[in-house]
Amino acid sequence: MKNMKPKKRLSLSVLLCIVAITMTGVALYLTLWAEATATEQGEISDVLKRESKTVFEPVLPDEHVSLPDDFRFHPDYQHEWWNYFAKVQDKHGKVYNIQWSYFRVATDERDTRGWQNPHLFIAHIVISNGSHVWKEQRVARGGIGQAGMTNRPFRLWIDNWNWRALGSTPFPGNLDVATDAFALDLNTTTSGPFVVNGDKGFQVKHALQSIASFSFSA
């Protein structure tokens, strides 16, 4: 935000003018090999490479994505994320690229509430138009209502950032993000059905390491 003038404000309110939009929900399981070197482990996030007795549900090929049931959190997996990509055009013809990402990460497998909840939520927004970049991030603890998800109706939130819909599916839906420097309010519909990626949602993510994911897109 430092490269923006303090009083400059971007506000986007767009209805049915999404050029391209993709949403993915992913739960990823990572197995670290005992022989991995310190350099190799250093390339993986500190949260994912924790060496402890914590055991999360593995992503296995005999499981599959089932919609609309999987429009929800999957706390048995260590982490998952949702991505919202859009390209919009304002009334002057200026094009803006938008990415909003939302992550849930568990530090261990405990099912506890309040401040003992092991989940961490992170979201970031990036907007660019070729000459400017606007960006902001939010981080929240789980278990205290600061961030979370419901699916009847569908809603992802962290602080005052919301992706919500009237029904149990993400679309048609609304993404509402506001910061001190910029804000956007996007109403979105889809032009086709949801797509389950890979083999019924299962995708191998690394040729050598035991890394796989479940994912779907719109």
Residue ranges and their predicted role:
Residues 2-218:
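Targeting-peptide/extracellular-domain and disordered-appendage signature
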